[in-house]
Amino acid sequence: MRDTIAKLFKPSNIGTAVFFALNFGLVLLIFAPYSFTPYGIATLLLVYTLTVAISLSPVGEWMLSVFAGAKEIKRTDVKLKLVPLLEAVYNNAKEKSPNMVDSIHLKMIPGNETNAYAIGRRTICVTEGVLNLSDEMIMGIFAHEIGHIANRHSQIQLLIGGANIFISTFILILKAIAWMITGTFGLFALGSRKFTTGCLIGLVGSLSTILVYLWVKLCGLFLMWSSRKNEFVADEYAYSIGFGNQLAYVLDNVIETQTKNGFLKALYSSHPERNERIARLQELGVTYSRW
């Protein structure tokens, strides 16, 4: 837990730290002035700590796996193909990061696309499309995902999930208050039949919706910035344990990481543009070339 919090303040996670600060600040404002009393702050911190504890527990990791549609691998032939490859990569990673978890739990997501996700402290989920790749390519994918686990990126995602539940609850409260005000003015307008009051009703309702939308977009901007930075960190980790060329080949030929056109779409992309990732790997020493 302490190591996860420490890694939250690494340069690549600045956006995530800003996300937490903004959202906790919002909660303080919603419940002001009560939230600025010692008892109020203690209550909010207690609720938030419980949310975080549940998120970082095996329960939180299991829930995220369920949401991702990941299932236990039951077929023997699939295990025989994937598990030895994962163990080979994990052994290299363990030498570099002795404090890493003692084992990695592998799960499968139905679907023909080729992708993989690190979840929580020790889970890697791969789609069925990964089975069509060569062993070298699969190890490149595993190395990248283990990079996320080693750098606690996947645990931080659990923290974000817990924070989203925490914040969403209070945003719902804020919206409920806004609609209560709107309803009160609406009843008054029906009784008085005043045009000005009717306009005020619409204004309050519209502003509450717009402000919530802008807040979510602002927080998403910081999260996506950190997500793109962390992809580079995981790529570098894969290179450092000996799988840089394999990862570069996968990025260039299999996994689509192209950022959509447009400045705003690029800002809200969770992954950097693939050519930039390959170029970074080549700067580190990867010898991969398409030709």
Annotated model-derived regions:
Residues 1-114, 164-229, 256-260, 284-291:
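Hydrophobic or amphipathic, alpha-helical segments that drive membrane association/targeting
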Residues 61, 126, 144, 234, ...:
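Residue-level signature of catalytic and energy-coupling elements of molecular machines
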Residues 103-105, 159-160, 244-254:
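Acidic/histidine metal-binding catalytic segments
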Residues 115-122:
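A short, glycine/Asx- and small/polar-enriched loop/turn
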Residues 125-140:
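Short pre-active-site segment immediately N-terminal to the catalytic Zn-binding motif
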Residues 130, 146-165, 243-244:
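Catalytic Zn2+-binding segment of zinc metalloproteases
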Residues 142-150, 233, 237:
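Active-site His/Glu-centered metal-binding helix of metallohydrolases
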Residues 226-230, 243-248, 268-291:
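Pan-zinc metallopeptidase signature
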